[in-house]
Amino acid sequence: MSSRREGRELALQALYSSDVEVMDGTTVLKRIMENFGDGSEPAVDAHSRSFSFAAELVNGVVANRAAIDQRIEEKSKNWSISRMARVDLNILRLAVFELFYRPDIPKNVTINEAIEVAKKFGADDSPAFINGILDEIASLLPDKE
């Protein structure tokens, strides 16, 4: 698994946990890092590329959450954010952050990665749901090279 994919998965878990436990995303990310694996050692090194990318994503989503949620709400026809599954919503938040705040990542990569994470963590219909909304949102952006 690539370090960015692992970072996206860690970020998703941190954002989901922070929704459930009403806790700071970075604190949750560190706790997840410490508790995964067999318990004998941290599953992810705090200095690893995966953790660094996850921390950037979590901090970016937290800092820009209102703008991100507004973009999701505008393009999710017949779905309010309050009705969305928490996993799906947080995958969308991560992807929208990448689309608008990480111009170095091509939008097709961001969308594909979100779909792959949704296949692993979401419901059966999550990948199609996420793809539909992200395609709508990405259509607002110029192509990234």
From Swiss-Prot:
List the GO terms this entry assigns under cellular component, sorted alphabetically: cytosol
Q: Which InterPro entries match?
A: NusB-like_sf, NusB_fam, NusB_RsmB_TIM44
* Highest taxon listed in the record's lineage: Bacteria
List GO BP terms, alphabetically: DNA-templated transcription termination; transcription antitermination
Record's keyword annotation contains RNA-binding: yes
| Molecular function as annotated in GO | RNA binding
Short name of one Pfam family: NusB
| Keywords linked to the UniProt accession | RNA-binding, Transcription, Transcription antitermination, Transcription regulation
- Described purpose of this protein according to its UniProt entry: Involved in transcription antitermination. Required for transcription of ribosomal RNA (rRNA) genes. Binds specifically to the boxA antiterminator sequence of the ribosomal RNA (rrn) operons.
Annotated family = Belongs to the NusB family.
HAMAP family given in the database record: NusB
Q: Which PANTHER family match?
A: ANTITERMINATION NUSB DOMAIN-CONTAINING PROTEIN, N UTILIZATION SUBSTANCE PROTEIN B-RELATED
Protein name, entry field: Transcription antitermination protein NusB
